[in-house]
């Protein structure tokens, strides 16, 4: 139980420390997610099952999540 408590404390420090240095919460959260778990790549892997050869036919560009501009639906929510 004590180990779980200290793990939670360390995770909170790890997440909030960059905020005290002027970072934004979205940047901190995105920094915790590996690039191969980007939403675009997950959707592409799910969608590739529908296409022969595993390649999307519309030629959609998939970029690295950390440097992509936000999609239009994310802009509307903010």
Swiss-Prot record:
Biological role stated in the UniProt entry: Moderately activates human somatostatin receptors (SSTR) with a preferential activation of SSTR1 and SSTR4. In vivo, does not cause behavioral changes in mice within a few minutes of intracranial injection, but causes a progressive loss of movement thereafter. Four to five hours after injection, mice recover, even with the highest dose tested. Shows antinociception and antihyperalgesia activities in two mouse models of acute pain, most probably by acting outside the central nervous system.
Location within or outside the cell: Secreted
Domain notes: The cysteine framework is C-C.
The entry's keywords: Cleavage on pair of basic residues, D-amino acid, Disulfide bond, G-protein coupled receptor impairing toxin, Hydroxylation, Secreted, Signal, Toxin
Lineage, broadest ranks: Eukaryota, Metazoa, Spiralia, Lophotrochozoa, Mollusca
Modified residues (4-hydroxyproline): 69-70, 72
Name of protein: Consomatin Te1
Origin superkingdom: Eukaryota
Other information: This peptide is an evolutionarily optimized stable analog of somatostatin. In addition, it adopts nearly identical conformations as in the somatostatin drug analog Octreotide. As this drug, it contains a D-Trp at the same position, whose synthesis is a common strategy used for enhancing the metabolic stability of compounds in drug design.
Propeptide: 23-56, 74-78
Sites bearing D-tryptophan, chain numbering: 65
Tissues where this protein is expressed: Expressed by the venom duct.
UniProt family annotation: Belongs to the conotoxin C superfamily. Consomatin family.
GO molecular function, one term: toxin activity
Transmembrane segments: none
Signal sequence region: 1-22
Cellular component terms (Gene Ontology): extracellular region
Disulfide bonds: 63-68
